Regions:
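Helix-to-loop junctions at the C-terminal end of transmembrane segments
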Residues: 65-76, 267-279, 363-364
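C-terminal transmembrane helical hairpin of 12-TM major facilitator-type secondary transporters
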Residues: 281-325
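Helix-breaking motifs and short loop linkers at transmembrane-helix boundaries and internal kinks
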Residues: 44, 76, 97-103, 131, ...
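Cytoplasmic helix-loop-helix junction between adjacent transmembrane helices
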Residues: 107-148
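Conserved MFS/SLC helix-loop-helix module at the cytosolic interface between two early adjacent transmembrane helices
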Residues: 63-101
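C-terminal membrane-cytosol helix-exit motif in multi-pass small-molecule transporters
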Residues: 175-195, 385-390
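Juxtamembrane intracellular "pre-TM" segments in multi-pass secondary transporters
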Residues: 2-8, 190-220
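Paired small-residue
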Residues: 87, 91, 102-110, 305-313
Length: 401
């Protein structure tokens, strides 16, 4: 076997383990959506207040990107993913054992801090290991793990919410999954190259500034923060919305919204053909249209059964849009890819924290119409704006010598 073939085989095995890590991280990102009504009941809180378990995780996840990204560039991305996985074991176990709501929120902060190093540094590792022309398709493999986890987390959250095991059982299940993947990742580290020598390193703040100075990076980062606010924020309250509007059980509401991830998986399977046929500008444009139309359809749907097919279309549109953003995040500053992808994730999850905060207050005090109408208007506008910016960026890049 040639050295190149051996390296490709090693990379394929590592990508498989990273996809497993992304699965459990994706589950952690969405499992509390379906648990919110159960948490509200168990701790005598409103759904909006119970949403602090999502806000705290998202804020910690976003803020820790500013540390994990530079650490990945310094000490090796796969090594930092492995450390993060062991941190997730501790964080999820602590959440399962939390004695009260405030302790649970605090432990979700710790869990979010650890989880911050898993998916973004996995993306950055792929950016280093896979040429750009094959990167969309390879990122789609990681996306399959993430989306499978999101779907499983949404479903499991609803099932646990309706069972005697409750939220503690949900978190203990994730602890066990993290433990398996952490051990597999530890075994993969034997084939990883050594981190760069000290002379090749630059200060953390300089790494962040170097990425921020790139005009295109600022466009990508602003766009993904908008996605966090208007897509992920309201999405957290959709199971509670279906439960309240149609009287569905939490497991049934969660199962319908879990089809969001199935739509994303459909994109991941078809990604190479979609990229060739549509191109990136039309992908983000149509992604924005599908997301916005989906939120409007959720608002207007006369029966609960329509929520599932709508979720599937929204999921497909999301990843037309998001995977294009994600691919550009790996190219914002190739020499500092870990920092670039970490800043991308920081903006996404700070946007999500803002969005969940606004959505929770809206849901508690104003109801479902503004909760769903805001994304229905904002997401198509964001897709149109980024599509225009992307075309201008391509034109400038093609005009350079």
């Amino acid at each position: 076997m040639s050295a190149t073939a051996a390296a490709q085989r090693r990379h394929s095995a590592t990508i498989l383990v990273l996809a497993g890590a992304a699965f459990f991280s994706g589950a952690a990102l969405r499992i509390c959506d379906s648990l919110l009504p159960r948490l509200a009941q168990d701790f005598s809180r409103t759904p909006g207040t119970a949403g602090r378990v999502i806000i705290s995780f998202a804020l910690a996840y976003g803020l820790m990107q500013l540390l994990f990204g530079p650490l990945g560039d310094r000490y090796g991305k796969a090594r930092m993913v492995c450390i993060a996985l062991f941190g997730c074991i501790a964080g999820s176990l602590a959440c399962a054992l939390a004695p009260n709501f405030d302790a649970l929120v605090g432990m979700r902060v710790a869990w979010g801090m650890a989880a911050a190093g898993v998916i973004p540094l996995s993306l950055a590792w792929i950016g280093d290991a896979v040429p750009y022309e094959r990167r969309q398709a390879t990122l789609a493999q990681l996306l399959t793990g993430t989306l499978g986890g999101m779907m499983a987390g949404q479903l499991a959250g609803g099932l646990f919410a309706d069972s005697a095991l409750g939220w503690r059982g949900a978190f203990l299940t994730l602890t066990a999954g993290y433990a398996v993947i952490a051990v597999l990742m530890l075994l993969r580290l034997r084939g990883e190259p050594a981190p760069p020598p000290p002379g090749a390193r630059i200060a953390f703040a300089s790494q962040l500034r170097a990425v921020w100075r790139e005009p295109w990076a600022r466009v990508v980062l602003a766009t993904v923060m908008t996605e966090g606010v208007f897509l992920l924020g309201p999405l957290a309250y959709l199971p509670a919305y279906l439960h309240q509007r149609y009287g569905l059980s939490l497991s049934a509401a969660s199962a319908l919204i879990a089809l969001y991830a199935v739509g994303g998986l459909a994109y991941a399977i078809a990604a190479p053909r979609i990229v060739r046929r549509l191109g990136e500008s039309r992908m983000v444009l149509w992604g924005g249209v599908l997301m916005g139309a989906g939120y409007l359809a959720w608002l207007l749907a006369p029966v609960a059964a329509l929520a599932g097919p709508i979720a599937l279309l929204v999921g497909f549109g999301t990843y037309l849009y998001h995977n294009t953003l994600q691919t550009h995040a790996t190219q914002m500053a190739p020499a500092l890819r870990g920092t670039s992808v970490a800043m991308f994730a920081f903006c996404l999850f700070v946007g999500q924290a803002i969005g969940v905060t606004l959505a929770g207050a809206t849901f508690d005090h104003l109801g479902s119409i503004p909760l769903l109408l805001g994304p229905a208007l904002a997401l198509p506008a964001s897709g149109w704006g980024f599509a225009r910016a992307l075309r201008r960026h391509r034109t400038r890049a093609d005009g350079q010598p």
